[in-house]
Amino acid sequence: ISNKTPRQSIKNGFAMLTEERRATGIFPYASILFNTVISNLGSYKKGPLLSDKKMASDTDWSISSMHIKTPSQKTLIKNLSGGNQQKVILGRWLLTKPDVLLLDEPTRGIDVGAKYEIYELILQLAREGKAVMMVSSEMPELIGICDRILVMSNGHMAGILERGKDFGGIENEQETIMRLAAQYV
C-alpha cells in the first residue's frame, strides 16, 4: 500500500481519525457542514460549482446517523462537546465510503455516552465487513471491542492476541498484555 497523499488514501478506501481532534481533526471556526464535507468535496461537484443541496443532505445524514446534538448544520464545530466533535469527524470519514478505518484514540476526552455510541459504531462497521484498526491506551476499551490485539513495546511488535484463541482469550488477559507491552523496555 502506497498512499502518498491524503487524497490518494481516500481514493484507495482509507480513512483516519487522528488522536488530536482539536489540532488535526477539526476546523474549529468552521461550521458542522464544512467539517462534514471537507474530505469528500469531489463528490459534491456540479459543473464548476459545489452542490449545496447534496452537501446539506449528507450533513443531515451525518447528524442523524451519528446522533450529533446540535441546533443546526451552521453551528461552529468548536461549540460542540468533544464527543459530538468526534462524531462529526467520524461522519465525515464515513461519507468517503472507506474500506479501512484507522482510529487513533477514538474516545479520548469524550463523555461516557458518546464513548458508547462510538463503540457501537465501530462494532457495526466491523459487522459490515470494514477493517477497523484502533489505537488506544485504554485496555478495557481494547478488550471490549477488538477481535485481535497487537501489542507494541518500544517500537517492536511484542505479540498478537486473538479473542477466544490465545491464552484463553483476550477478555481475561490484561496481565499478558501488560507483560508483552513491557517486553522490550
Model feature map: region roles:
Residues I1-V185:
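Glycine-rich phosphate-binding loops of nucleotide-dependent enzymes
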